[in-house]
Amino acid sequence: MTNQDNYCVIMGGGIGSRFWPFSRKTLPKQFLDFFGTGRSLLQQTFDRFQKVIPTENIFIVTNAMYADLVKEQLPEVSENQILLEPARRNTAPCIAWASYHIRALNPNANIVVAPSDHLILKEDEFLAAIEKGLDFVSRSAKLLTLGIKPNRPETGYGYIQIDEPAGENFYKVKTFTEKPELELAKVFVESGEFYWNSGLFMWNVNTIIKASEDLLPELASKLAPGKDVYATDKIGRASCRERV
């Protein structure tokens, strides 16, 4: 039985410019069946999280221009689960906006935030890590990211350097490094202290909102006044009018 306090936010608003010409602005990569499975990357991501998150607790944040594509590919998702961005503002506003919305639904919510375009081969191990991470953030006011043990020096990924342990298989983060040069990537891998940054995050909703208020006060000041709109049928109309 899935935990009703657990939520998922799938970020699906990118235009996938690095995969041009396969991925285009009108049909970006998350809506494509890249691997011939019969399911797009977005659909595979939804299917994956549906195994550990209640269906009604999975939200898709996407650009308003992709609303019809999301509805077509995920007919089991209600309109209230599709949060439409009026403009692309990158990750922080996307996460903060979804968090305010989810807190209005459930002030005890634990959230996993995931890109819509990941390929996951060891799905059982992945989902076990997600469940363990959500349990951790439900008991700890920490921001959690999922690291992947590197098997080669890769310059296309970000790296996380771990610090002291914070529990079994949990570590404090010492540094983040975005896409290092090859020689530095080799040093990272050989040290055993670095993990690839997966781009997946987990936290309790109150923890992330407090972090937004403390670290991004200008952003939080724009989102906090919407408390009467979040978790209502006004959210779609408001999101298409207001630019953050």
Which sequence ranges carry the predicted segments?
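Catalytic core of tubulin tyrosine ligase-like
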Residues: 159-241
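Conserved N-terminal catalytic core of the sugar/cofactor nucleotidyltransferase
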Residues: 1-10, 18-25, 36-115, 121-127, ...
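Generic secondary-structure signature for well-ordered alpha-helical cores
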Residues: 47, 51-54, 75, 100-107, ...
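Short, well-ordered, mixed-charge alpha-helical segments that flank or form enzyme active sites
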Residues: 119-123, 152-157, 184-185, 209-210
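Short beta-strand segments
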Residues: 10-12, 61, 112-115, 145-149, ...
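Conserved donor-nucleotide/metal-binding helix-loop-beta segment in metal-dependent transferases, i.e.
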Residues: 122-154
